[in-house]
Regions:
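Cysteine protease catalytic domains with a Cys-His-Asp triad
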Residues: 2-154, 167
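Long, domain-scale functional regions
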Residues: 38, 179, 183-200, 218-223, ...
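Intrinsic-disorder-associated interaction segments
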Residues: 46-53, 67-75, 95-99, 120, ...
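Exposed alpha-helical structural elements
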Residues: 101-104, 126, 189-192, 241, ...
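Intrinsic-disorder/low-complexity loop/linker signature
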Residues: 114, 123, 163, 182, ...
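Cysteine protease-like catalytic core of ubiquitin/ubiquitin-like
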Residues: 133-237
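Contiguous terminal or domain-adjacent regions
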Residues: 237-351
Length: 351
């Protein structure tokens, strides 16, 4: 008999979107156009972007134009991102293309960073199968949270010496909110994801959720997940420590104000424990303000990952990528991150 977990009401957000719709829309099909057919009409609009973003966009356009024998689906992805970024926030079409090209990006970055061991799972069941089959000491996954949704989470996994598996789920937006009665409302999918994991693995696996909260838009969880997985890999000392505490003590937090417990699962405030780089692409200045209020010491931390480039703080980053669209002012840094990763795949993925 499975473990019985009481379910709090779920927070029914945009993540309830049907997964088939998300990944199989006809809008995501690859056209027969050559790369330059779709780039050139939008080139004049790139100058309207913040200078740093414009530079990354032009670099992608150049890479696409110069590429030989490029994967048609990857080329179409790049074309549509270039067409969209010049004029609007990411659309559902871009989100669909994110999903459709995830395998290519995963392959590219696994080759770039030996030991990253990044996987992806199209359903929660597919993730659980990978968890059961893997004996890797350290790996990561970008996984669908619920089989009837399209929202993804990044998961950092450790296999301990005794065979126990520990999972740190990184939520891009908000794993839960509280209603007017102060009752926890979990985001759609979390109750089922955790319950199914405990049913299948019982005491052989432990899980904690880190509420990062960098995403404020309704579309675009996958680029955040990708960055969180990379950050967890590069900050493995911190994550090793979190995993060990979860394994040894059943929780990661060392202070009462760092986390809340809902139905026995720990939900940790990322703003209170994560390094600055996890908020490099935060869309809202208010998010940065919260992080710096919780961790004043990281205000001067360099979040630049460009080798040999100038140092850059969180506040400098959000200013550099600030843009106004549809009466909304926000940082488009995560869009630049998507663009950089597509360019990496175009230049270095060989199938």
């Amino acid at each position: 008999m499975g473990i019985c977990i009481s379910k709090p009401p779920t927070l029914d957000m945009h993540y309830r979107a049907n997964n088939e719709h998300s990944e199989n829309e006809t809008a995501s099909s690859s056209p027969s156009h050559s790369p330059t057919q779709e780039i050139d009409p939008y080139a004049s609009s790139f100058s309207q972007l913040p200078p740093r973003a414009s530079s990354k966009v032009r670099a992608l356009a150049d890479a696409l134009r110069l590429a030989n024998n490029i994967n048609p689906e990857l080329a179409h992805y790049a074309q549509r991102v270039l067409a969209t970024v010049a004029n609007s926030q990411p659309t559902r079409e871009i989100s669909n293309l994110d999903a459709k090209n995830l395998a290519t990006l995963v392959r590219t970055y696994n080759a770039k960073y030996p030991g990253l061991n990044l996987q992806y799972a199209r359903t929660p069941g597919e993730f659980r199968n990978a968890l059961a089959d893997s004996d890797e000491a350290s790996w990561r996954s970008i996984a669908i949270l619920h089989s009837q949704g399209s929202h993804r989470v990044a998961i950092d996994v450790r296999t301990h010496d005794d065979g126990h598996k520990s999972l740190l789920v990184m939520e891009t937006a908000a794993a839960f909110k509280r209603d007017e009665n102060d009752e926890a409302l979990l985001q759609f999918g979390y109750s089922e994801f955790i319950e199914d994991l405990k049913y299948e693995f019982g005491s052989n696996a432990s899980i904690a959720v880190i509420d990062v909260g960098a995403q404020k838009s309704h579309i675009g969880c996958q680029p955040f997940c990708f960055d969180f997985a990379l950050n967890a890999f590069h900050k493995s000392d911190l994550f090793d420590d979190l995993h060990q505490r979860l394994h040894d003590h059943g929780q990661c937090s060392t202070r009462r104000d760092e986390a809340e417990f809902i139905d026995g699962t720990e939900y940790i405030s990322g703003a209170k424990i994560l390094p600055a780089v996890f908020y490099k692409h935060a869309e809202s200045r208010a998010t940065i303000d919260t992080v710096l209020r919780e961790q004043p010491a990281i205000a001067s931390k360099d979040v630049s990952t460009h080798r040999g480039g100038p140092a850059e703080t969180l506040q400098e980053r959000v200013r550099a990528f600030r843009i106004q669209r549809d009466e909304i002012t926000y940082s488009m840094s995560i869009e630049a991150s998507r663009i950089r990763k597509i360019r990496e795949a175009i230049e270095n993925d060989h199938g």
